Amino acid sequence: MQHSHFDAIVIGSGPGGEGAAMGLVKQGKRVAVIERYDQVGGGCTHWGTIPSKALRHAVSRIIEFNQNPLYSDQSRLINSSFSQILRQASTVISQQTKMRQGFYERNHCTMYSGEAAFIDDHRISVRYPDGTCDILSADNFIIATGSRPYCPPDVDFSHSRIYNSDTILDLEHEPRHVIIYGAGVIGCEYASIFRGLRVKVDLINTRDHLLSFLDQEMSDALSYHFWNNGIVIRHNEEYDTIEGVDDGVIVHLKSGKKVKADCLLYANGRTGNTDTLGLENVGIKTDSRGQVAVNAHYQTSCEHIYAVGDVIGYPSLASAAYDQGRIAALALTTGTSETHLIEDIPTGIYTIPEISSVGKTEQQLTAMKIPYEVGRSQFKHLARAQIAGMNVGSLKILFHRETKQILGIHCFGERAAEIIHIGQAIMEQKGEGNTIEYFVNTTFNYPTMAEAYRVAALNGLNRLF
């Protein structure tokens, strides 16, 4: 049994853990990173963001090819299965893992591949797969253990046709019909992927409309696009029982309806990976979903233990987790941090087409009684979109009628998650630098998707009187 002491120990090597570890070593700290699996990267790299987005990219390219008259008129349609595309996506995972492993090696982080659990305030055990154990100690700790799909106890996830958003990546059979329970971000993204592969999709939503945190217009656009592509959305429904049968799954809904399909993807919530950490030994409590409460500097109730990423809940974004880790590292080393997450964090939803937003929605601005105006552009009117055959989509800019300050930007369409950053950069400018007039006073490359900003700005400014 090995006993080692470090300035700081980071538990987890996903985006939050990586940001924390890199921030600490840059401050000259001796750092250990404990990862429960044999490869770094966390759920983001191996089961979440990277594989699902690689899948989505492949499916969207197949759709693009099949809808292009140059190819479809010649009966050259591509028909690829979920498992075939997933095998191709695995190459991206290996590239990401190798790159991130290099970060830790070059920065001289000491790596441990095992299960971490607190013994007391300054000691932690690392249990390895072979049953052996090391005891490590540190002055400070950063918990970045991430989250996993919430699996209710009354659903039999051992059944061969019932999956969660992690195990769906092990899908080997080719379903013709899938039920997705939960119409949040993950559910909607997988609905797009399966429908893009011509699989029938029943999307069961426990709420009254899709992705209620979005601007209503974006939510409605996604709902219409799903409907137009044959996805059946069942709003305001909850399961009574989920029954696995020999040839598939039957979902018995509380409304009395029944839905049957070849398989089911349960995608209704996530829970923090805290149950095996021994947090009771250091006096840290979690909520019903295993999440840890922190202050503005990401300190837990135990002042030398910090937590970042999905394990603390909102916003549960890989991009935010990395920044949280970096900020926590700075607070840990200096005692405080002047750096905070930006107020308006962009969200990217990788449905087909994408959705991305930053800032306020129309609903929020109306409730706040802020006098705003709207500028819109339709992708179908942009030369670049016409050239690329990506006519579905729109950009909406919300701005203050009097000051012209940009208050929110909402985009639906191909490359939305990239396009949003142009507007975000202007929104983050101080004082008079944040103005919608920037887009009419600046010359953009032509033809580009960035032209959407100029069109939307002119549209909005023309509404003023």
UniProtKB/Swiss-Prot annotation:
GO terms for biological process: 2-oxoglutarate metabolic process; NADP metabolic process. It catalyses: NAD(+) + NADPH = NADH + NADP(+). Keywords: Cytoplasm, FAD, Flavoprotein, NAD, NADP, Oxidoreductase. Binds 1 FAD per subunit. This is Soluble pyridine nucleotide transhydrogenase. Its EC number is 1.6.1.1. Pfam families: Pyr_redox_2, Pyr_redox_dim. It comes from Proteus mirabilis (strain HI4320).
